[in-house]
């Protein structure tokens, strides 16, 4: 058996005999080396390996003992507070380590970045315990699986990992490679907050932060690593939900990509839940099949109420393992968040300290979160952990657009959908990133924040993936947020109709109207669906307000996106699709004018 004697001599000082035996059982020199190097760098007082249900319970206790989490009245519920300036993903402090300049990617020279973050991590765990968690991204015993190790001095971070990911110690036996994540909360000096992503070594370093988007490695930090892997290997690692929607001919699985805070989680609750956030997609025998790399949900809590979100509401109120973060803890040991239909409390504690109702400040942060296991959801699909994944028949790209995009459109083809819908996404920014709310930003596939490589290379892989498929999913563009003045033109429940129409398109049971930007529903089909699903009268005036094409606005958008992709030297196929779309729009403007109702195209 291969044993790193130098490693074991060092680790024996920090690790119990029981833990040493666990490492010996693995017989994995990469694991030994990773733990040793991190321990030597961060200088913890002890090391604890998280490999079993017993260890998960230990982490729960440590989270309470260290006061990183506080217990609440409801059994299994705890609350965590992040630093007031550490409430969202830190774009400006997150770097892809490469010597190349990449459009839209925050890069730093690899050598400089490694040197900087290692200096910040030096002795960062002094006086603390170092936790080592062994996980599987994706179902075990699956072609989709990627192994990962998270090292952290934060019980909250490891507790979150234990809820969100499959603990999988045994699969590290033998010299298997894995993704590596090193996190230390350090001194929580926000000026020295750094997240460094080293694609060359499949390693992410994170320091002086606890917000989960910056610290829980297997979440959005791992997404950068797996996107790069997917492009090299010809599959897709996506910021997408996976949902099974019921149709007349059975369950049809869709992926759904929305920017944060734009409807992805609520859409996931409309069907059978497999994933609310991430998807690994592979071509298997000519079919696109997908799995959820996770087994939990880290969701935005603001606005969740019993009427609009009954499933999530139930999950958050029943005895169950839940970590609330950056909401209000009430005096009687419960929680409150903005948009909840619980009674607003008079006072409590939040991430800024004492709060009272007369302070005229929100009780919770707009990016406050909940972390729960998938098994808590009553709409969980039976295939959520299927190692073979599920067949994807539809792909949804959704945005938060107040002015231009119609509620639902279907692409002419896979490449048309990828380029003119997915790769052309512009959406109002939300509080999940540090910056101004409601600013429009270019966000293709809702993944630009996590892009580790050239966007053109990523899109090229998407287009090639499409070509490999014998059975191609239909692609749809969704927009739940169209307004007339300051008034939304749709209710939250209306999304059920757009989803049902997409399902009927997959089943081939409704026809469409051809327009220059894609295929749109007939009024009569939507009227029927509104009546059947929502018991609601859908008028022809509603239809015209929602589906009249603002061709001048679509043209402006097309020009912006085309210019952008030309500047970054995107693949020729991307440019061609956008130029063809431009030609179609111009022809229709010449014939019908700048605004056109689908009723005039029948």
Swiss-Prot record:
GO terms for cellular component: cytosol. Mn(2+) binds at residues 220, 239, 277. Its main location: cytoplasm. The keyword Lyase applies. Gene3D superfamilies: 3.90.228.20, Phosphoenolpyruvate Carboxykinase, domain 1, Phosphoenolpyruvate Carboxykinase, domain 2. It holds the Pfam family PEPCK_GTP. InterPro entries: PEP_carboxykinase_C, PEP_carboxykinase_GTP, PEP_carboxykinase_GTP_C, PEP_carboxykinase_GTP_N, PEP_carboxykinase_N. Binds 1 Mn(2+) ion per subunit. GO terms for biological process: cellular response to glucose stimulus; gluconeogenesis; glycerol biosynthetic process from pyruvate; oxaloacetate metabolic process; propionate catabolic process; response to lipid; response to starvation. It is found in: Cytoplasm. Substrate binds at residues 89, 211-213, 260, 367-369. Belongs to the phosphoenolpyruvate carboxykinase [GTP] family. Catalyzes the conversion of oxaloacetate (OAA) to phosphoenolpyruvate (PEP), the rate-limiting step in the metabolic pathway that produces glucose from lactate and other precursors derived from the citric acid cycle. This is Phosphoenolpyruvate carboxykinase [GTP]. It comes from Sulfurisphaera tokodaii (strain DSM 16993 / JCM 10545 / NBRC 100140 / 7).
């Amino acid at each position: 058996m291969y044993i790193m004697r130098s490693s074991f001599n060092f680790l024996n000082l920090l690790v119990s005999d029981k833990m040493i035996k666990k490492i010996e059982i693995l017989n994995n020199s990469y694991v030994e080396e990773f733990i040793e190097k991190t321990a030597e760098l961060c200088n913890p007082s002890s090391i604890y390996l998280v490999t079993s249900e017993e260890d998960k319970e230990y982490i729960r206790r440590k989270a309470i003992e260290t006061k990183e989490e506080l217990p609440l009245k409801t059994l299994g519920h705890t609350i965590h507070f992040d630093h007031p300036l550490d409430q969202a993903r830190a774009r400006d402090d997150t770097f892809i380590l490469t010597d190349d300049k990449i459009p839209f990617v925050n890069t730093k020279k690899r050598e400089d970045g490694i040197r900087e973050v290692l200096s910040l991590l030096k002795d960062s765990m002094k006086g603390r315990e170092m936790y080592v968690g062994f996980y599987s991204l994706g179902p075990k015993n699956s072609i989709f699986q990627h192994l990962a190790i998270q090292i952290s001095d934060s019980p909250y971070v490891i507790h979150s990992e234990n809820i969100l990911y499959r603990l999988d110690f045994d699969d590290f036996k033998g010299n298997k490679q894995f993704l590596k994540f090193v996190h230390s909360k350090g001194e929580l000096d926000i000026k020295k907050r750094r997240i460094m992503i080293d694609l060359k070594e499949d390693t992410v370093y994170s320091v002086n932060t606890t917000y989960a988007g910056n610290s829980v490695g297997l979440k959005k930090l791992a997404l950068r690593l797996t996107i790069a892997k997917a492009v090299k290997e010809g599959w897709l690692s996506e910021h997408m939900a996976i949902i099974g929607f019921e149709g007349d001919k059975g369950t049809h699985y869709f992926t759904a990509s929305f920017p944060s805070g734009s409807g992805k989680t609520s859409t996931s609750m409309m069907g059978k839940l497999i994933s609310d956030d991430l998807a690994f997609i592979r071509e298997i025998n000519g079919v696109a099949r997908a799995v959820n790399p996770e087994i939990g949900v880290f969701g935005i809590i603001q606005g969740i109420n019993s009427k609009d979100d009954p499933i999530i509401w139930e999950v958050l109120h029943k005895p169950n393992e839940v970590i609330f973060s950056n909401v209000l803890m009430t005096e009687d040991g419960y929680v409150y968040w903005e948009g909840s239909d619980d009674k607003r409390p008079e006072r409590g504690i939040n991430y800024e300290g004492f709060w009272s109702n007369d302070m005229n400040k929100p009780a919770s942060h707009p990016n406050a979160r909940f972390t729960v296991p998938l098994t808590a959801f009553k709409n969980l699909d039976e295939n959520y952990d299927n190692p073979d994944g599920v067949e994807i028949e539809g792909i949804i790209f959704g945005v938060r657009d107040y002015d231009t995009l119609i509620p639902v459109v279907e692409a002419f083809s896979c490449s048309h959908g990828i380029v003119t819908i997915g790769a052309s996404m512009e959406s109002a920014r939300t509080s999940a990133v540090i910056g101004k709310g409601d600013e429009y930003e270019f966000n293709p596939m809702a993944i630009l924040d996590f892009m580790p490589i050239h966007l053109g290379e990523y899109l090229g892989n998407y287009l090639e993936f499409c070509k490999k498929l014998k059975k191609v999913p239909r692609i749809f563009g969704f927009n739940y947020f169209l307004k007339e003045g300051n008034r939304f033109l749709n209710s939250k429940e209306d999304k059920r109709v757009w989803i049902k129409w997409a399902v009927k398109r997959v089943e081939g049971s409704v026809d469409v109207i051809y327009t220059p930007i894609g295929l749109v529903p007939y009024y009569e089909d939507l009227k029927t669906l509104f009546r059947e699903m929502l018991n609601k009268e859908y008028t022809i005036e509603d239809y015209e307000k929602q589906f009249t094409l603002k061709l001048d606005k679509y043209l402006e958008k097309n020009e912006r996106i085309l210019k952008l992709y030309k500047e970054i030297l995107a693949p020729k196929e991307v440019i061609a699709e956008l130029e063809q779309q431009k030609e179609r729009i111009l022809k229709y403007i010449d014939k019908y004018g700048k605004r056109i109702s689908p009723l005039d195209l029948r």
